Amino acid sequence: MTVKSQNRQTKKLAGERIAILFTQAKVFAGINPAWSDRCVERARAIAMRQRMRMEREQRRQYCHHCYAYFLHGVNVRVRVHRGHVIVTCLNCGRQTRYQVVRTDNR
């Protein structure tokens, strides 16, 4: 097996593992939030080790300051203001802003 194919295979495996960790974080969120936060930390570590980006949906499911898994209505507040979505982590108070992109589906 060549180095290039090994690299592709490990990145694919890492992506699958990250997806599994985020599903586990969702399950653990109601049971023990510390476990779900740990799953997020492990997923980030895998992504950094493999030098790959997480998907947009995965990146928006946790706080980038305290790495807490977001449970809407419990530890996160979401507001829409002037074309931006403002996500506030209620654990650390950090605000993250995402631009709202309007699609042309009129």
Swiss-Prot record:
Which molecular-function annotation in GO is an example for this chain?
ribonuclease P activity
One of this protein's GO BP terms?
Answer: tRNA 5'-leader removal
Which key words tag this protein in UniProt?
Answer: Cytoplasm, Endonuclease, Hydrolase, Metal-binding, Nuclease, tRNA processing, Zinc
Annotated binding of Zn(2+), by residue? 63, 66, 89, 92
What is the top-level taxon of the source organism? Archaea
Give the record's family classification: Belongs to the eukaryotic/archaeal RNase P protein component 4 family.
Q: What is this protein called?
A: Ribonuclease P protein component 4
